[in-house]
UniProtKB/Swiss-Prot annotation:
Keywords: Glycoprotein, Malaria, Repeat, Signal. Residues 173-351 are annotated as: 18 X 10 AA tandem repeats. Sequence repeats lie at residues 59-74, 75-90, 91-107, 108-123, 124-138, 139-153. Residues 59-90 are annotated as: 2 X 16 AA tandem repeats. Residues 24-47 form a propeptide. Residues 1-23 form the signal peptide. Residues 91-123 are annotated as: 2 X 17 AA tandem repeats. Glycans are attached at N40. In the intraerythrocytic stages of development of P.lophurae in ducks, there is a synthesis of a major protein that accumulates to comprise at least 50% of the cellular mass: the histidine rich protein. The keyword Protease does not apply. This is Histidine-rich glycoprotein. The keyword Phosphoprotein does not apply.
Length: 351
C-alpha cells in the first residue's frame, strides 16, 4: 500500500526507518520519489508498508560489541568478548576482564572509577564492584569463590583472565581471610591464623571470601573509608573488624575492600593477600569476576585507598569500620566473624 506523507518527517528519519526494513524497497522508493524542496519535504507514493521496528533487547549490563546479537536473557554483569554468543542464562557477576583495569558492575569504565581515594559502590584505585561479590578471586594471586568456586587460586592462576594476578598483591593482607577470616589470627567461616584457612584458607596470606590485611575491608574497606559500609582508620561495618577481624565474605588487605577488593591495590569480589584467592583473585594486578590490578576494580576494587561498597584506606561503605568497630559483626584485634579481618578489615568488606 502506498501512502502520501506530507511534512511528516525528514528524509534522514525515513532512511533510518528504512534500515530496519526487510528490503531496500523503501529506501530506493524514497530516493526515487522524494523531491528536494528545501526544509519541507513532500513525499508522494512512498512505500512504508514493510518497515519494522528494531527489536528491543533487555540486558542489564551487557558489554558487547554492537554487532553481537544476544538471545534474551538476564545477565547482571556479563563481560565477554564481543564475538561470543551467549545463550540465555543468569549470571550474577560474570566479568571477565583481560585487563588489569576493569571495572564492573561492570561499569563502563566510568561506571565507577576510583583512584587515589575513591569510594563507590565500589572503589579501588580505580575500580568498583558489585556488592554481589562473588566470583572473585583472591590471593597474592588467587581468588576464590565467595562460595569458593568458580575461582582459581594459586599464586597466579585464574581462568584465562577470569582473574589475573600478578606482581604481588594480596588481597588480604598477609593476614586476612574472610568468609574467612584472617588476621594474624582469626578464623571464620574460615579460620586463619597467621596461617589458617577455611572455606578459605589463609596463611599470612590468605584470603577469604575476603581477605584482610592489616588494613582492608571489604564490602568495605578501610584504611579509612566508608561506604555502604564505612570504614575508618578503623571501621566497622555490617561487620566490624578491628586490629584483626574479619567478616563475612570480605577480605581486606592493608587497603582493600571487598565485594570489594582490597589490597594495596586490589579488590575483590574479594581479593586476598599476598597469596590468596577467592572467588576472586587478586594480584598486585588482577581482576576478578572482577579483576583487579594495582588498580583494578571489582565489583569493587580498591587500591591503596579506595573503598567501595567497599572502602579502603579511606572509604566507608554500607559498612563502617573504625579502628575498632563492630557491627553485625564485631572484631577486635583478633576476632573473626562471619568475617574475619586482620589488622584492620572488616567485612562484607575487606579492608
Amino acid at each position: 500500500m502506498f501512502t502520501s506523507l506530507k511534512k511528516v518527517a525528514t528524509f534522514s528519519f525515513l532512511v533510518w526507518i528504512s534500515q530496519y526494513s526487510g528490503s531496500n524497497s523503501c529506501s530506493s522508493s524514497l530516493v526515487k520519489h522524494i523531491p528536494q524542496t528545501g526544509s519541507n519535504l513532500t513525499f508522494d507514493r512512498v512505500l512504508v508498508e514493510d518497515t519494522v521496528h528494531p527489536e528491543h533487547l533487555h540486558e542489564e549490563h551487557h558489554h558487547h560489541h554492537p554487532e553481537e546479537h544476544h538471545e534474551p536473557h538476564h545477565e547482571e554483569h556479563h563481560h565477554h568478548h564481543p564475538e561470543e554468543h551467549h545463550e540465555p542464562h543468569h549470571e550474577e557477576h560474570h566479568h571477565h576482564h583481560p585487563h588489569p583495569h576493569h571495572h564492573h558492575h561492570h561499569h563502563p569504565p566510568h561506571h565507577h572509577h576510583h583512584l587515589g581515594h575513591h569510594h563507590h559502590h565500589h572503589h579501588a584505585a580505580h575500580h568498583h564492584h558489585h556488592e554481589e561479590h562473588h566470583h572473585h578471586h583472591h590471593a597474592a594471586h588467587h581468588h576464590h569463590h565467595e562460595e569458593h568456586h568458580h575461582h582459581h587460586h594459586a599464586a597466579h592462576h585464574h581462568p584465562w583472565f577470569h582473574h589475573h594476578h600478578l606482581g604481588y598483591h594480596h588481597h588480604h593482607a598477609p593476614h586476612h581471610h574472610h568468609h574467612h577470616h584472617h588476621a594474624p589470627h582469626h578464623h571464620h567461616h574460615h579460620h586463619h591464623a597467621p596461617h589458617h584457612h577455611h572455606h578459605h584458607h589463609h596463611a599470612p596470606h590468605h584470603h577469604h571470601h575476603h581477605h584482610h590485611a592489616p588494613h582492608h575491608h571489604h564490602h568495605h574497606h578501610h584504611g579509612h573509608h566508608h561506604h555502604h559500609h564505612h570504614h575508618h582508620g578503623h571501621h566497622h561495618h555490617h561487620h566490624h573488624h578491628h586490629g584483626h577481624h574479619h567478616h563475612h565474605h570480605h577480605h581486606h588487605d592493608a587497603h582493600h575492600h571487598h565485594h570489594h577488593h582490597h589490597d594495596a591495590h586490589h579488590h575483590h569480589h574479594h581479593h586476598h593477600d599476598a597469596h590468596h584467592h577467592h572467588h576472586h583473585h587478586h594480584d598486585a594486578h588482577h581482576h576478578h569476576h572482577h579483576h583487579h590490578d594495582a588498580h583494578h576494580h571489582h565489583h569493587h576494587h580498591h587500591d591503596a585507598h579506595h573503598h567501595h561498597h567497599h572502602h579502603d584506606a579511606h572509604h566507608h561503605h554500607h559498612h563502617h569500620h573504625d579502628a575498632h568497630h563492630h557491627h553485625h559483626h564485631h572484631h577486635d584485634a583478633h576476632h573473626h566473624h562471619h568475617h574475619h579481618h586482620d589488622a584492620h578489615h572488616h567485612h562484607h568488606h575487606h579492608h
